[in-house]
């Protein structure tokens, strides 16, 4: 290889000298040497491609992820050889027109890009298969039950390993371009997988909206780690995540809308004033959301306080999350508390409206409201909601308890006034 490159160097030097003479009689020699140099460059490209191909057999990333092991890198001896070939090809092709990627960079991106895509395809398939409903259509998504976390870890490990391969072979100004070209195919497959997951979430919105929050957190953390090590790919990953991010943003208002619709379509309430199942369902939803405070806080910050009532997604292109936006902090907890109290207020106000229409007598309506408030309070106290809602929700809960008490005692008001009427008479002299 060294002798071949030296021969090409001599040919290249001769070509430069002939071009410098600018004599018409040298044009045939210049043409012959240019063709010879072109053939030599093509041969070097084939050698470069073949060397990349030898170490591009697909691997199974799951084993590396489960063991926490580093993903394989190219041997240092091979990267040195590849760098030598690339440097020569870059010098030869630089005499022609400038292109975004040289022949060797394109060959590297094709061979290594295919290796990454094929290696990750099983993790992509697992992410889709684990999203399928197992416990019935009403089964609520359980945190960590989808394979997206393993898929993201596989992408992160392989991209960082590939960046470590690229740096010794190519010049610094080429690192970003070569990395993007190498990862482009697997990024497209990743974006396609996220679109399929987004469709699944939309089809099972009430039970699987939590999967959108999990994907948002997992993929954003992956993006931060890759950017921290490579300085690249953040925008590309953010574009792939966009459908999930928009679905997660719209979920907050859609859940409230679904709650109103379900309650307004209720045509029967317990005749004894017992609490209705939807109250427990709503509180369980809020309990589950506490496990996703980080991504939900990021969503709420982008919407603004109260923005879930009338979300504006027209500026979604500007909502690329930052590391700071995923820090829950005091304001994140406060936003979640406001959303939770809005949810509880929506629940209770619609329950009161339906009780007036479906239950006879204010006392029964009062019992109904009191029983539902009792469920709300109990489920707050018995979960992580206690620390988040103790200050924000209690005044509103107290107001509803007072209203329930007033409704219950309203029937007895006239009677109690008569029974408790006291007349004082003065003693006779």
Indicate residue ranges for each PLM-predicted region.
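Long alpha-helical rod scaffolds of large eukaryotic non-enzymatic complex subunits
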Residues: 1-429
């Amino acid at each position: 290889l060294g002798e071949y490159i030296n021969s090409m160097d001599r040919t290249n030097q001769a070509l430069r000298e002939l071009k410098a003479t600018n004599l018409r009689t040298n044009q045939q020699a210049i043409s012959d040497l240019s063709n010879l140099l072109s053939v030599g460059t093509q041969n070097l490209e084939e050698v470069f491609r073949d060397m990349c191909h030898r170490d591009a057999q697909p691997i199974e990333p799951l084993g590396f992820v489960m063991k926490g092991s580093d993903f394989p890198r190219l041997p240092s001896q091979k990267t040195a050889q590849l760098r030598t070939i690339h440097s020569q090809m870059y010098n030869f092709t630089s005499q022609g027109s400038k292109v975004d990627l040289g022949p060797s960079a394109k060959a590297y991106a094709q061979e290594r890009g295919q290796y990454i895509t094929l290696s990750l395809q099983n993790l992509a398939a697992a992410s889709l298969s684990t999203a399928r409903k197992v416990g019935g259509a009403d089964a609520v998504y359980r945190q960590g039950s989808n394979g997206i976390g393993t898929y993201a870890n596989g992408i992160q490990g392989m991209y960082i390993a590939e960046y470590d391969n690229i740096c010794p072979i190519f010049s610094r100004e080429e690192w970003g371009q070569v990395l993007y070209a190498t990862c482009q195919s697997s990024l497209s497959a990743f974006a396609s997988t996220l679109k399929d997951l987004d469709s699944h979430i939309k089809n099972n919105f009430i039970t699987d909206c939590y999967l959108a929050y999990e994907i948002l957190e997992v993929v954003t953390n992956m993006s931060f780690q890759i950017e921290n090590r490579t300085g690249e790919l953040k925008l590309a990953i953010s574009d792939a995540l966009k459908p999930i991010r928009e679905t997660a943003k719209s979920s907050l208002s859609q859940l409230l809308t679904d709650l109103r619709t379900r309650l307004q379509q209720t045509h029967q309430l317990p005749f004894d004033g017992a609490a209705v199942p939807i109250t427990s369902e709503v509180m369980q939803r809020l309990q589950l959301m506490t496990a996703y405070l980080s991504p939900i806080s990021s969503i709420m910050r982008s919407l603004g306080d109260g923005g879930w009532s009338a979300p504006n997604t027209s500026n979604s292109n500007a909502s690329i999350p930052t590391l700071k936006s995923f820090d829950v902090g005091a304001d994140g907890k406060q936003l979640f508390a406001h959303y939770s109290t809005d949810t509880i207020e929506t629940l209770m106000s619609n329950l009161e409206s339906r009780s007036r229409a479906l239950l006879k007598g204010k006392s029964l309506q009062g019992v109904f409201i009191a029983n539902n408030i009792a469920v709300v309070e109990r489920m707050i106290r018995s979960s992580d909601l206690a620390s988040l809602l103790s200050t924000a929700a209690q005044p509103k809960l107290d107001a509803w308890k007072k209203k329930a008490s007033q409704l219950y005692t309203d029937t007895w008001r006239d009677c109690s006034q008569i029974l408790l009427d006291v007349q004082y008479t003065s003693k006779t002299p």
